[in-house]
Curated annotation (Swiss-Prot):
SUPFAM superfamilies: beta and beta-prime subunits of DNA dependent RNA-polymerase
Name used for this protein in its record: DNA-directed RNA polymerase subunit beta'
Biased composition range(s): Acidic residues: 1384-1404
Gene name of this polypeptide: rpoC
Subunit structure: The RNAP catalytic core consists of 2 alpha, 1 beta, 1 beta' and 1 omega subunit. When a sigma factor is associated with the core the holoenzyme is formed, which can initiate transcription.
């Protein structure tokens, strides 16, 4: 067989009968396997030595030839060739079938390839193949068509009438004949002609048929090969038979399946020889067809063939499928030698790059190295005795072990390996005992703890492997998280506590002067004598100046690198991490690692000296709690009475109650924390643990000492009975019972969601695994715009954080001097980002993977910085896999998050008013305002309030000597004018100058506040507003419909009992009128308000509660109906993970919103078509047609007659459908939307993921285009094609003077995109294995082995990192004794450790 390294690509095709014979070494004629007495294979049976090769090395079946001397001799007596027994793994046989059978993959798969070629349905095919109906092959003059089905009677009728001219057949024979008669070229031409004549493609089946025909034409496959005359028999070692103790045999299911085929085939041969009646022969042929079906794909048949114990037998297809199949079990994941696993324990004495390796394990893992060393030192004469010495554990073995292990890195892995930091390399340090010792600071990366976790250890053997392990995987190279570039080695728990204690400060007594010291030694001496404590405030002479600090902080600062600014503040875990990141940035990884070890030592030491413990006395309940709970009870009572009077609905009451308790809980938490902070002078152990970030969170402590709060039901609904006790006071029985709900949900969720997150990661890896950095610069002109992320006016992500690690796509220009500060393609480091921010930019254009035009993978400039090392990415970096891991890994983390808070619900307090936290000026109020009875201005439709920050304001006469002009941008601290008194006036923050009406203003950014219908506005245009002044008030629980005129109400298409339900509340006797869905009737529910000649109509959606009766009088601004907003479910990644999933899978949401297809004016027609309302959009351009929009009756329409909409505006309520965004707004809008939405979910959980990782995945989802017009290209309409392949083909066609194809971009979800990759190996190993392989075989696909997965499957080195193609062509020059004369092969062979080579010789 060929070596697995001497090919670049693999093609898969249908096998012709000749090809199957070529593979075969002989025909299997008997169903026998082995002789049960001699246990030797039967001749001509399924294990026959003559066909498949000898079972014993260098020995024939009868024993005439025994020795390697006779290699290649074929025994004249038994016919067996003398050779290796290994050939039984590769030699195939065959079975000559007495009648052709159809291959199940090609007729039973959806869509059936055979059916498409013959233009028959699967059922029609089945009835021919299973001998139920005849198919016409040559109709003669009968007037019937070829391929039509007829029954037995008709067949005989036609035969009598037309004689031999009329040909029809039954069974696979007939199908084979039909397939052989197909002229693929002519048929394909005919269909293309048909499509062009039809103009628009109506029939999808025609297109599918064309695709299959052209696949056969281009691949060189013949259609009749889908029907088999010969069945190949796979090598016997791949379907083994083994003897169990007790003399029984275990055998592979395939042998049973082959046996059935051979039995039936032999029986059929006998029947044909005996010229048996047709009906018997047909039955046997049908059974043969079923036997072959079962052999190839047993699970696809309705009634699978069962073996012992009623278990379906595993067919060839089942061997490949699923997690236990060949692909995932044996090709993508293998067990490896030189590995071991053991429990881990903490190793506080280790350095960052070390791990403790138990001597017992080391002895076994390094065995060959030890044996070689023993022989080298003449401690053993040969390998065999060295082996005995090692097994006897002699004293000298341990001396040698120390030497062998020294500087030989090993890899540690903790399952589940969710990201690349789950495997890291360390230098082993030999330890006693049986547990592996792990450095405490690497735990976070492995997500390991010491409660019984196990880790696996692997030894890299060859020098090359050791070198890579050393250079790339050693733990000091992995101190940053590849997902975001933050340190992942930060201290946790005890260490944090120790550092916080060391750097905190006791309040100094007033009036007592500070003790002074002249240097660090004096301070140490004073501590030892007990004169000062670590946390006492002192003054000390340090680095040339007097400092007020504490001894603890002085000690901490000694471990920081030289020249680092003095840290004079208490350090929590976040602060410590910030310092680590800063040191990494300024001093590089080497200094950082040394500092980490020092932090570990300090932390442990001072945590031990501080020795905090928690007693029940430390959990202090705030004295104000009783009052707060009392107030809350009163408010709940008030809400109840409002409900009983009918002022509010039950749903509103429920929401109010939940909000009251949420607010109360927050207040209690606050007062409790204040109480804890005061306790013990700020050193209450519970408080310190939370404040330092060592253990526990505000949420958890609130449950210990505040109140447990609201709990959620398993459905995610919040129970309105709040738990008023905490764990310190103890819960009542009822409270305890309510608690169990949430706690149990937490545990169940954890189990389920972990699997979900794992599956999400698997799909992400599959779609993005072939994205590898392939070149330096793809030369694209495209780019994306990145800016500050804000929520309201709070900056969530600064510009510096967002653009960090990217390349600029345009020159960055100083707006004041107009000079280029940073040219295009500058890498944005922290400094560059800061400078850009200081120039006043709030967004800039940067290169992005989304717009990269590399043919394979992405380029360095579009990708930017490698977040794990903060240097530009290098060619060969597998950025796709890193992206997938970065998104998937937190998914799993987050799923486990619910578990720790114990199911306590976290609801958001609903805001009732719009306000901003700064002084502002109202620039505009967009929307329709009407004045109600109380003279308030009310929005009758959706609108917005535009407010601009007012930074400073002066009268112009108060200023002299203006330094700026109207409209100019100014920076913070920039001089804008001087006062008459000569004082300088500077800008307090970046802004824009605005001078008019005698006023000089510096204005900040505009904020647009969207406002819903029914909002009451408290401000006017040009008003100046104060911080937190209510600008507008609204009902947080309901959307409302408002009358715009005074008049009389008329119900239209609203009928009680049909589409209006009368709900009576039993507790209050209040009556609610609720609009319900009406399926059968064409009702268009509306409320009209009539006033004299004018009339306004308002559409009423499903679930609305009607507030007015037919004939009521209403005033402008009155509420006609309310729509309750959905109750807040608990906000948790349980909501989040499915959201990420649906975004990446590009699922269409259930109630998708409708987007305006064009700019224009709305006309609501009032027509109802198929339970949908019809609207029209009239474009501005009168030449264009009006656009028809249909909206389900039940949905609330956001627009009114005569409103102007822009392309892409939402016309009704609902969720955005990504496919609609792509169609209406284009690719860029969709990319931005997807990245933003995914980030939103993770940000809510406080998880940082760099945008570029999400962009890499989104890029893969948008790789395909859909052909709308094939032009002169080889594409078929409606075919999905890779964008790059499409562009190449179009270039080719244009160069030849043809007309190019046209296409639209399409969005594919993860699963679809993975199954549509160019590589069939990658797709087949992902999902739907048989379908992928069927398709690939027919198309004669070639896999160019570009991605990682397909290379792992084949057994090649992956084309990433040091395996990148460009590195393969490098020869190594050695300046030693002329060894460049030797060919490279010899070099390779020498790399095997000597001991292993010798050991294998010794065994032979």
């Amino acid at each position: 067989m060929r070596s697995h390294n001497d090919f670049e690509s693999i093609t898969i095709r249908l096998a012709s009968p000749e090809r199957i014979k070529e593979w075969s070494y002989g025909e299997v004629k008997k169903p026998e396997t082995i002789n049960y007495r001699t246990l030797k294979p039967e001749k001509d049976g399924l294990f026959c030595e003559k066909i498949f090769g000898t079972t014993k090395d260098w020995e024939c079946y009868c024993g005439k030839f025994k020795s390697i001397r006779y290699k290649g001799v074929v025994c004249d007596k038994c016919g067996v060739e003398v050779t290796h027994s290994k050939v039984r793994r590769e030699r195939m046989g065959h079975i000559e079938l007495a009648a052709p059978v159809s291959h199940i993959w090609y007729y039973r798969s959806v869509p059936s390839r055979m059916g498409l070629l013959l233009d028959m349905t699967v059922n029609q095919l089945k009835s021919v193949l299973y001998f139920e109906k005849y198919v016409i092959i040559d109709p003669a003059d009968s007037g019937r068509n070829r391929g039509e089905l007829i029954d037995e009677e008709e067949y005989h009728g036609y035969l009598d009438e037309y004689g031999d001219k009329f040909v029809a057949g039954i069974g696979a024979d007939a199908i084979k004949e039909l397939l052989a008669r197909i002229d693929v070229d002519a048929e394909a031409r005919m269909i293309r002609q048909k499509i062009q004549d039809k103009d628009k493609i109506s029939d999808k089946r025609i297109l599918k048929r064309l695709e299959v025909l052209e696949a056969f034409r281009d691949s060189g496959n013949r259609p009749e090969w889908m029907v088999l005359d010969i069945v190949p028999v796979i090598p016997p070692e791949l379907r083994p038979m083994v003897q169990l103790e007790g003399g029984r045999f275990a055998t592979s299911d395939l042998n049973d399946l082959y046996r059935r085929v051979i039995n039936r085939n032999n029986r059929l041969k006998r029947l044909l020889a005996l010229k048996a009646p047709e009906i018997i022969v047909r039955n046997e042929k049908r059974m043969l067809q079923e036997a072959v079906d079962a052999l190839f794909d047993n699970s696809r048949r309705k009634r699978a063939v069962k073996g012992k114990g009623n278990r379906p037998l595993k067919s060839i297809s089942d061997m490949l499928k699923g997690k236990q199949g060949r692909f995932r079990q044996n090709l993508l994941g293998k067990r490896v030698d030189y590995s071991g696993r053991s429990v881990i324990v903490v190793g506080p004495e280790l350095k960052y790059h070390e791990m403790g390796l138990p001597k017992k394990m080391a002895l076994e893992l390094f065995k060959p190295f030890i044996m070689k060393r023993l022989v080298d030192l003449d401690l053993a004469p040969n390998i065999k005795s060295a082996k005995k010495k090692v097994e006897a554990e002699d004293k000298e073995v341990f001396d040698v072990l120390e030497y062998v292990v020294k500087e030989h890195p090993v890899m540690l892995n903790r399952a589940p390996t969710l990201h690349r930091l789950g495997i890291q390399a360390f230098l082993p340090v030999l330890v006693e005992g049986k547990a592996i010792k792990l450095h405490p600071l690497v735990c976070h990366a492995f997500n390991a703890d010491f409660d019984g976790d196990q880790m696996a250890i692997h030894v890299p053997l060859t020098p090359k492997a050791q070198l890579e392990t050393w250079m790339l995987m050693l733990s000091p190279h992995n101190i940053l998280n590849p997902a975001n570039g933050h340190p992942i080695c930060g201290p946790t728990q005890d260490i944090v506590l120790g550092i916080y204690y060391l750097t905190s400060e006791l309040p100094s007594e007033p009036g007592v002067p500070l003790k002074s010291f002249s240097n660090l030694e004096e301070v140490h001496y004073a501590i030892d004598r007990g004169v000062v404590e670590f946390r006492t405030k002192i003054s000390v002479y340090h680095q040339g100046k007097i400092l007020e600090t504490t001894p603890g902080r002085l000690i901490f600062n000694t471990i920081l690198p030289e020249g680092y600014a003095y840290v004079n503040r208490p350090l929590s875990d976040k602060e410590t991490n910030r310092i680590i990141a800063d040191v990494y940035d300024k001093y590089g990884p080497a200094k950082t690692v040394l500092m980490l070890d020092d932090i570990k030592k300090l932390g442990y030491r001072y945590a031990t000296l501080f020795a905090p413990t928690i007693s029940i006395e430390d959990i202090r309940v705030s004295p104000g709690k009783v009052g707060l709970v009392g107030d809350a009870n009163k408010e709940v009572e008030k809400a109840d009475s409002e409900y009983r009077k009918g002022i509010i609905t039950n749903e509103e009451r429920r929401k109010k109650v939940i909000e009251i308790w949420t607010k109360t809980n927050d207040l209690i938490t606050e007062s409790m924390f204040k109480e804890l902070e005061k306790d013990k002078g700020g050193f209450n152990p519970v408080f310190i643990m939370a404040a330092s970030g060592a253990r526990g969170s505000k949420q958890q402590i609130r449950q210990l000492a505040g109140m447990r709060g609201l709990m959620a039901k398993p459905s995610g609904e919040i129970i309105e009975l709040a738990i008023r006790s905490n764990f310190r006071e103890g819960l009542s029985v009822l409270e305890f019972f309510i608690s169990t709900h949430g706690a149990r949900k937490g545990l169940a969720d954890t189990a389920l969601k972990t699997a979900d997150a794992g599956y999400l990661t698997r799909r992400l890896v599959d779609i993005s695994q072939d994205v590898i950095i392939s070149e330096d610069d793809c030369g694209t002109e495209e780019s994306i715009s990145l800016g500050v992320v804000k929520e309201g006016e709070n900056v969530i992500v600064s510009l510096n954080d967002r653009v960090f690690g990217r390349y600029t796509a345009e020159d960055v220009i100083d707006p004041v001097t107009d000079q280029v500060v940073y040219p295009r393609n500058t890498l944005i480091t922290r400094e560059v980002g800061q400078k850009v921010e200081n120039l006043g930019y709030d967004k800039i254009r940067v290169r992005s993977p989304l717009t990269c035009e590399s043919k394979q993978g992405v380029c360095i400039r579009c990708y930017g910085m490698d977040m794990a090392r903060l240097i530009p990415a290098e060619i060969g970096e597998a950025v796709g896999t890193i992206a997938a891991q970065s998104i998937g890994q937190p998914g799993t983390q987050l799923t486990m998050r619910t578990f720790h808070i114990g199911g306590a619900a976290s609801a958001k307090v609903q805001e009732k008013e719009h306000k901003v936290s700064y002084t502002g000026i109202v620039n505009n109020i967009n929307g329709r305002l009407i004045t109600n009875e109380k003279s308030q201005s009310v929005f009758s439709r959706r609108g917005s309030i535009v407010i601009q920050r007012l930074i400073q304001q002066y009268k112009t006469e108060e200023l002299s000597n203006l330094r700026v002009e109207n409209g100019q941008k100014v920076d913070k601290g920039e001089l804008v004018a001087t006062s008459p008194a000569g004082e300088n006036i500077t800008s307090e923050m970046p802004g824009t100058i605005h001078i008019e009406n005698g006023l000089f203003r510096i204005l900040g950014e505009e904020a647009v506040i969207p406002v819903k219908t029914g909002t009451i506005v408290n401000v006017k245009v040009n008003d100046i507003t104060q911080p937190n002044q209510p600008l507008a008030e609204f009902d947080p629980y309901n959307e409302v419909g408002i009358s715009e005129i005074d008049g009389t109400v008329q119900w239209m298409d609203l009928e009680i009992g049909k589409n209006v339900r009368r709900d009576e509340d039993l507790r209050t006797s209040n009556i609610l009128l609720k609009v319900i869905e009406q399926r059968r009737e064409k009702l268009n529910p509306r409320i009209a308000v009539i006033s004299g000649g004018s009339r306004e109509e308002y559409s009423v959606p499903v679930d609305a509660i009607i507030s007015v009766q037919d004939g009521d009088k209403v005033k402008a601004g009155d509420i006609l109906f309310k729509i309750p907003t959905v109750a807040e479910k608990t906000r948790d990644i349980t909501g989040g993970l499915p959201r990420v999933d649906e975004l990446f899978e590009a699922r269409r949401p259930k109630d998708a919103t409708t987007l305006a297809e064009t700019d224009g004016k709305i006309e609501i027609s009032g027509e109802i078509v198929k339970e949908k309302r019809v609207l029209y959009i009239h474009p501005d351009n009168p030449d264009l047609e009006k656009v028809k929009v249909t909206i389900p009756i039940g949905k609330q329409i956001r627009v009114r007659n005569g409103d102007f909409v822009k392309r892409g505006d939402q016309i009704d309520d609902g969720n955005l459908d990504p496919h609609d965004i792509l169609r209406v707004k284009g690719v860029t809008a969709l990319q931005v939307y997807l990245v933003q939405e995914v980030q939103e979910v993770y940000r809510l959980q406080g998880v940082h993921i760099n945008d570029k990782h999400i962009e890499v995945v989104v890029r893969q989802m948008l790789r395909k285009v859909l052909i709308t017009d094939s032009g002169d290209t080889s594409f078929v309409n409606q075919q999905q094609i890779d964008r790059l392949v499409f562009n190449e083909e179009n270039k080719r066609v244009i160069a030849e003077g043809g007309s190019p194809a046209e296409s639209v971009p399409i969005l594919l979800g993860l699963t679809k995109a993975s199954l549509n990759t160019e590589s069939f190996f990658s797709a087949a190993s992902f999902q739907e294995t048989t379908k992928v392989l069927t398709d690939a075989a027919i198309k004669g696909k070639t896999d160019n082995l570009m991605g990682l997965k397909e290379n792992v499957i084949i057994g090649h080195m992956i084309p990433a990192g040091t395996g990148t193609k460009k590195y393969k062509d490098i020869a190594v020059f050695k300046s030693a004794y002329g060894d460049l004369d030797r060919p490279l092969e010899e070099e390779e062979e020498e790399e095997i450790p000597q001991a292993i080579a010798e050991e294998s010789d010794a065994e032979e």
